UniProtKB/Swiss-Prot annotation:
GO terms for biological process: cytoplasmic translation. PROSITE patterns: RIBOSOMAL_L2 (PS00467). Residues 35-49 have a biased composition (Polar residues). This is Large ribosomal subunit protein uL2.
C-alpha cells in the first residue's frame, strides 16, 4: 500500500490523502456472493429518525462475508483481494478445494495464491482460523467469536487485533485494542494475525462531499441550534453551552458511561476505562 498526497488543484483536494493498494482486484466482485441492500437514511418503519447523520450516499451491494470459517480441514487458496464499501477492511475471495468460493476478512500479510486452513488442526499461521482452545497464549488474533458458532464479532475493522492472554477452564482472556480484557469461551474461533489495510486510519477525506458519497450527513453543533432543538441552543449572538455537554435528549455525553447490559458484565474482566 502507498500513501498518496493529492496534487492541490482545488481546495477540496489540497488536504486529501489517499491510501492506494495496487494489489486490489480492479474488476467486478464475485456475483454469487452479492446481496442487494436498501438504505433507510437512519429511519425506522414509522419514518422517524433513529440514527442521525445518515442519508444519501452511493448505491452498493452487500458482500456476503464468511465470519464463521467453518469449513474445517479443507484448504482454501486466496484468489484475489477486493475493496468492500461496507467496511474499513479489505476482503479476500478464497477458493476451497471442493470448489466453493467465499469472502473472508483479508488478514495482514496474506497474498494472492496463499493457502489458508480452518479447524483445530490448522497450523498457527496468519489467516488460519482455529478454536481458541488450540491457539497458543500470547498469539495476536482477530475476527473473534463471542459465542461458539455465531461468527466473528470482535476485532474485524481495518488494522485491529487482540491478544490471547490466558486460558482457565472453559474460558480464555482476550485483551482488545481498546484495552478491555474480556472472557470468551475456548470453543469460540479466532483468526491468527491482524486485520489488513492497517493504513486506513491515515487517509484524509479532504472535503465534505467525500463523506456525502459514503452516506454520512453533516453534524450540526448543539450551540448553533435553537432552544427547541437542543439543550445547548439559544442565546444572543455566540454563546457557550452554559452547562455540561449533553445529547439532544439531555443525556450527559463526552465520556459519560451509558452501558446497561448487565447480562454480559461478568464477561468483562477489565473495562477499557482505567478509572
Amino acid at each position: 500500500m502507498a500513501i498518496v498526497k493529492v496534487k492541490p488543484t482545488s481546495p477540496g483536494r489540497r488536504a486529501m490523502v489517499k491510501v492506494v493498494n495496487k494489489d486490489l482486484h480492479k474488476g467486478k466482485p464475485f456475483a454469487p456472493l452479492l446481496d442487494s441492500q436498501s438504505t433507510t437514511a437512519g429511519r425506522n418503519n414509522n419514518g422517524h429518525i433513529t440514527t442521525r447523520h445518515k442519508g444519501g450516499g452511493h448505491k452498493h451491494h452487500y458482500r456476503v462475508v464468511d465470519f464463521r470459517r467453518n469449513k474445517d480441514g479443507i484448504a482454501a487458496k486466496v484468489e484475489r483481494l477486493e475493496y468492500d464499501p461496507n467496511r474499513s477492511a479489505n476482503i479476500a475471495l478464497v477458493l476451497y478445494a471442493d470448489g466453493e468460493r467465499r469472502y473472508i476478512i483479508a488478514p495482514k500479510g496474506v497474498t494472492v495464491g496463499q493457502q489458508l486452513m480452518s479447524g483445530s488442526e490448522a497450523p498457527i499461521r496468519a489467516g488460519n482460523t482455529l478454536p481458541i482452545r488450540n491457539i497458543p497464549v500470547g498469539t495476536t488474533i482477530h475476527c473473534i467469536e463471542m459465542l461458539p458458532g455465531k461468527g466473528a464479532q470482535m476485532a474485524r475493522s481495518a488494522g485491529t487485533s487482540a491478544m490471547l492472554l490466558a486460558r482457565e477452564g472453559i474460558y480464555a482472556q482476550v485483551r482488545l485494542r481498546s484495552g478491555e480484557i474480556r472472557r470468551v469461551h475456548v470453543e469460540c474461533r479466532a483468526t491468527i494475525g491482524e486485520v489488513g489495510n492497517e493504513e486506513h486510519s491515515l487517509r484524509q477525506i479532504g472535503k465534505a462531499g467525500a463523506n456525502r458519497w459514503r452516506g454520512i450527513r453533516p453534524t450540526v453543533r448543539g450551540v448553533a441550534m435553537n432552544p427547541v432543538d437542543h439543550p445547548h441552543g439559544g442565546g444572543e449572538g455566540k454563546t457557550a453551552a452554559g452547562r455540561d455537554p449533553v445529547s439532544p435528549w439531555g443525556t450527559p455525553t463526552k465520556g459519560y458511561r451509558t452501558r446497561s447490559n448487565k447480562r454480559t458484565t461478568s464477561m468483562i474482566v477489565q473495562r477499557r476505562h482505567k478509572r
